[in-house]
Amino acid sequence: YEILRCLVGSEMCIRDRNMIACVDSDYDYLLQGATHTSRYIINNKYVFHTYAYAIENYQCYAEALHEVCVMATLNDHPLVDFVAFMRMYSQIAYPLFIWSVWFYRKHNLSEFSLLDFCSYVKLDRVSVYHPERSLESMSRRVRRKLLELERRHPKALEEIEAMKREFAKLGVNEDNTYMFIQGHHIMDSVVMRLLVPVCNVLRRERETEIKELAEHNMQFHNELTSYQRRQLGVDIVLRKHTSYKLSPLYKKLEADIERFLKHI
């Protein structure tokens, strides 16, 4: 099929059975028709969307991150439990994420924009051996902002709770929130900030192992050179792997496409 950006604001309309559009959902899936773009994307049978915010969220699928590190470093030491880490990240971000979408639904981005939200749910310096510390710092920021928003908008609290129930039906929960946060932010300000130091440690481990097993300097240098040539940048692996095809959201998208193909 043809992949293109759906220009909802233009005169282009996708109604031709010979052409479908595949687009990032952004917040449009969660807005559930609160904007013209959202209505167009979720109601047009010729438009398929990612469900996750964007393709980058799939590339950062937690269950795939260990394999990404293995492919990049050729070291399979499970240094960090990525699934548990991203679950904890999601649980911390979740309540503020609900507020972020609420402001979008109210068309009030001057008070709390997407950029504002992302500034609260980023990681600062990450310790490979104590990654939870970066989450503790983020948690403090999020709690302060939540208290501020709750004081400013006490009448919104019932709506916020209703949105949580609504989002659960849409597949969003406290454990997978990272799949619905801006994709570039998750990749650049969360996952890469974790993967880069992890891969650096894994590479040093493998180089130390090569040195310890080498019987002489020439063997060490030859094997070290060979190892260095076979390494890949973790950013490259992250963008090229396809392990996200096992994710529930991807399976949901696959099912949509299969249903569509049966009726053309």
Task: List each model region and its residues.
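Acidic beta-strand-to-loop metal/phosphate-binding motif
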Residues: 15-30
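Activity-critical C-terminal alpha-helical subdomain
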Residues: 41-219
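Single conserved hydrophobic/aromatic residue that forms the stacking wall/gate
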Residues: 2-13
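Switch/connector loops and helix/strand junctions flanking conserved nucleotide-binding motifs
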Residues: 28-33, 57-59
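Generic hydrophobic, helix-prone segments enriched in Leu/Val/Ile
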Residues: 5, 53, 92-96, 250-261
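Charge-dense, extended regions
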Residues: 196-264
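Short, aromatic/basic amphipathic alpha-helical patches
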Residues: 31-41
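Acidic side chains
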Residues: 2, 24-26, 56
